[in-house]
C-alpha cells in the first residue's frame, strides 16, 4: 500500500531563510545521529520519518558515520527514501557530512580533498541519490590546510553532487576564513552547525552568531536538548532506558559526569520555569533557541514518533519576557557540555 503524506503538512511548520540564501529550512529539522542504525528496527525508523514529514519537517540531517555501524543510517534512510519518499524528493532537504573516522587507513578521516570527496561518493551510493542538498565539513582538521578543505567543498558543488555546503563546530575565526576561501571559488557558505543549547552557550560567548549574520550564513543548532539532559528524564537519576545508561562512556555523548549538582540544580529550575510557561522543559529549550531569528533551525532527534509532535508544539510560544530571560541566565551555570570543543575552540 502506497503511503501518502499529510496534505496539510505545510500549514503547521515555520520555515526560515537560511542566511542570505533563497533556501528555507523548517524551524525544526530531524537529525539521524541516533536511532537509525542497523541496531534499530526499520519500522520504527519509518514511523519517525513519516511523522516528521507529516508535521512539515522537510530537512533530514545525516553524516557518513551515523549508525551504528557507521554508514548504516544512510543505508536505512536510503531504503526508506526509495520505499516511501521517492515521490517527495524535491520537497526534501537532505544533508550529510564527512570529517570523523569512517574507514581504516590514512584516508578515512579528516578534512583532506581525498577523504571528503570519496566520502561524499560513498554517501550518495548508500542513500541512492545523485546529489545531497547540503554537504558539510563535519569538523576542523588541524592537519589539513583550510584551503584544501574549501576546495573539496567547492568541487562538491561544481560537480553537481551537492547543492550547498556547510561547516560544523568551527570557531568564529575559522568560519570567517572559510567564508573567504569559498568566496574565491564563487561558492557561498550556506550554513554552520554548532552544538548549542541552554546549558552550552559557546555560540553566544564566542560571537559566532554575529559572524554568521555578518556573512549571510545560516545556523542550525545540534544537541538543542543537551542530548537528553533538557528533556527532564535525568532529574531523578539515570533511567535504565536512557542513552546515558546504555552508552556509558563508550561514545562521544552523555556521561554520568555531566550530572553535577550544578547541572541538576539548573535543570530543576528550568523545569519549574517551563511549567509556568505551559511548556515541557524540552519545548522551552527549543523555544529559547528559536527566539533568535539568526537561528535558522534546530536539529531534534527522536526514538518515538510521538516525541516529534511534542517538539513541534514548541513553535506555539517563542516569546520570552525580559524577566524570563534574566531568570534563565541567573539559573544557568554553563555546564561545559561542549563535547566538540576540540574542534570549535580553534
From Swiss-Prot:
InterPro entries attached to this UniProt entry: GAP_reductase (IPR047628), K_chnl_volt-dep_bsu_KCNAB-rel (IPR005399), NADP_OxRdtase_dom (IPR023210), NADP_OxRdtase_dom_sf (IPR036812)
Alphabetic keyword roster: NADP, Oxidoreductase
Cysteine pairings via disulfide bonds: none
SUPFAM superfamilies named among the record's database cross-references: NAD(P)-linked oxidoreductase
EC number(s) reported in the record: 1.1.1.-, 1.1.1.2
Site, Important for catalysis: residue positions: 61, 66, 97, 138
Domain of life: Bacteria
EC supergroup of this enzyme: oxidoreductase
GO biological process, one term: methylglyoxal metabolic process
Binding site residues for NADP(+): 33, 61, 66, 168, 193, 223, 225, 227, 233, 303, 307, 311
One function term, GO molecular function aspect: oxidoreductase activity, acting on the CH-OH group of donors, NAD or NADP as acceptor
Function according to Swiss-Prot or TrEMBL: Aldo-keto reductase that catalyzes the stereospecific, NADPH-dependent reduction of L-glyceraldehyde 3-phosphate (L-GAP) to L-glycerol 3-phosphate (L-G3P).
Similarity field: Belongs to the shaker potassium channel beta subunit family.
Protein name: L-glyceraldehyde 3-phosphate reductase
Organism of derivation: Escherichia coli O157:H7
Amino acid at each position: 500500500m502506497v503511503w501518502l503524506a499529510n496534505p496539510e503538512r505545510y500549514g503547521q511548520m515555520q520555515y526560515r531563510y537560511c542566511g542570505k540564501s533563497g533556501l528555507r529550512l523548517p524551524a525544526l529539522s530531524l537529525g539521524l545521529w541516533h536511532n537509525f542504525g542497523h541496531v534499530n528496527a526499520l519500522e520504527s525508523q519509518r514511523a519517525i520519518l513519516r511523522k516528521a514529514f507529516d508535521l512539515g519537517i522537510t530537512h533530514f540531517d545525516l553524516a557518513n558515520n551515523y549508525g551504528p555501524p557507521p554508514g548504516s543510517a544512510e543505508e536505512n534512510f536510503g531504503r526508506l527514501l526509495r520505499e516511501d519518499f521517492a515521490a517527495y524528493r524535491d520537497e526534501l532537504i537532505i544533508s550529510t557530512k564527512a570529517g570523523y573516522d569512517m574507514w581504516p587507513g590514512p584516508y578515512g578521516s579528516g578534512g583532506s580533498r581525498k577523504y571528503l570527496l570519496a566520502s561524499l561518493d560513498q554517501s550518495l551510493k548508500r542513500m541512492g541519490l545523485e546529489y545531497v542538498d547540503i554537504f558539510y565539513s563535519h569538523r576542523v582538521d588541524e592537519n589539513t590546510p583550510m584551503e584544501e578543505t574549501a576546495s573539496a567543498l567547492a568541487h562538491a558543488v561544481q560537480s553537481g553532487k551537492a547543492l550547498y555546503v556547510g561547516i560544523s563546530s568551527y570557531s568564529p575565526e575559522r568560519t570567517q576564513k572559510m567564508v573567504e576561501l569559498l568566496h574565491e571559488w564563487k561558492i557561498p557558505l550556506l550554513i554552520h552547525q554548532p552544538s548549542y543549547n541552554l546549558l552550552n552557550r559557546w555560540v553566544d560567548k564566542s560571537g559566532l552568531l554575529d559572524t554568521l549574520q555578518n556573512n549571510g550564513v545560516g545556523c542550525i543548532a545540534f544537541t538543542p536538548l543537551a542530548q537528553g539532559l533538557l528533556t527532564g528524564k535525568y532529574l531523578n537519576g539515570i533511567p535504565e532506558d536512557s542513552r546515558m545508561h546504555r552508552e556509558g562512556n563508550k561514545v562521544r555523548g552523555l556521561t554520568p559526569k555531566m550530572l553535577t549538582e550544578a547541572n541538576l540544580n539548573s535543570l530543576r529550575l528550568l523545569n519549574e520555569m517551563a511549567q509556568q510557561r505551559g511548556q515541557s522543559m524540552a519545548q522551552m529549550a527549543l523555544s529559547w533557541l528559536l527566539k533568535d531569528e539568526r537561528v535558522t533551525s534546530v536539529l531534534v532527534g527522536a526514538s518515538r514518533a510521538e516525541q516529534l509532535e511534542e517538539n513541534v508544539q514548541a513553535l506555539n510560544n517563542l516569546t520570552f519576557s525580559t524577566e524570563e530571560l534574566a531568570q534563565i541566565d541567573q539559573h544557568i551555570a554553563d555546564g561545559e557540555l561542549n563535547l566538540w570543543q576540540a574542534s570549535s575552540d580553534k
